[in-house]
């Protein structure tokens, strides 16, 4: 160790002296003595590393309290930080999918603050069933005989297969052997459930006779999987759910369906593309239908299964059901969301997912044009700002081909350097409320479809 290094080490303050500084007293009040002391020890270690490697004091040496404050604030930030989603993907899986309705937020808050009748029957003063209230609602909305709730749709598919067809064959069209995010594949789920996959048809064409010919003494289920995250076009043929249900009745084989996104309303009435609805499949005679809670339905993450009472009873009594069951917060949010569907006239106003999906291109463009001048005053020296037409997508594997006309604020660097776009996007990600856009075709695009809180957005962008 050189004499210069020893001199620099000697200038480092003692923890006890720092703790009695007035600035650190306020930090101790806010974050606690233990956390502040632990931080100061790490800061001293960092300072020694700087001295050892550079023979200089750290650049924050003159204001230990300010550096400590910044580090404590960063450490205190939640891992789940609110962001402003201007990616153009409404149901963005990486950003949490569906925003919850105010009614759902209030229901979750109430469920967290007090004991609730999760599994308590007020009438009989005994044990109740946690799915009961939601099952009643879901039956009313879909026309099913009963319903079951688990923590996501992948779990719902696993439970359906394990409880009703373990040790048996499940017949599925080859064109419906989907893979969704995280390498979740239908064949893999079947193996986990103890089922044997029996593929029929080809990738692009499957006929009713293929299902009939596949049925044997070991067939447990006929299964339909909605290909919600891709589309096969051209020379194609599929067997619709109603026809497959008729085959199932003829051969006395239950038919189950994985709808994936699962919309409870006819989206075409809002000018959106049609998606199959659980109530249509139930009316067609499908025995069990599963779908997600946090996609087109607009609620919390959940797997919902509706269908025949006897088969739902099999699911409820299976050991996996307890492992996959939903908690009280999920059930509270889902119940509040489902109740919105009982008042369909107000649904597009109260349900954030539907509200964002149904925004008109004209209103989005008007919003972008209104904000353009103020943003140009802040960023115009480096970037050309334009309002351009763009196409939003629904996201989360819902309606993969269809796009929604929208409008975006675009930022193009005057010098044409792509690195400026990367730097700008990175800067926005460090904001107190990060702004997330996308870089494409030499521009940074902010699709305004999902922008509802303009004041917060402008506060961030003008920092």
From Swiss-Prot:
Disulfide bonds: none annotated. Converts seryl-tRNA(Sec) to selenocysteinyl-tRNA(Sec) required for selenoprotein biosynthesis. It comes from Salmonella newport (strain SL254). It is found in: Cytoplasm. Homodecamer; pentamer of dimers. Binds only one seryl-tRNA(Sec) per dimer. One of its GO terms (biological process) is conversion of seryl-tRNAsec to selenocys-tRNAsec. Keywords: Cytoplasm, Protein biosynthesis, Pyridoxal phosphate, Selenium, Transferase. It catalyses: L-seryl-tRNA(Sec) + selenophosphate + H(+) = L-selenocysteinyl-tRNA(Sec) + phosphate. The keyword Protein biosynthesis applies. The keyword Aminoacyl-tRNA synthetase does not apply. Its EC number is 2.9.1.1. One of its GO terms (molecular function) is L-seryl-tRNA(Sec) selenium transferase activity. The modification N6-(pyridoxal phosphate)lysine is found at residue 295. It is an enzyme of class 2 (transferase). Its cofactor is pyridoxal 5'-phosphate. The gene is selA. One of its GO terms (cellular component) is cytoplasm. This is L-seryl-tRNA(Sec) selenium transferase.
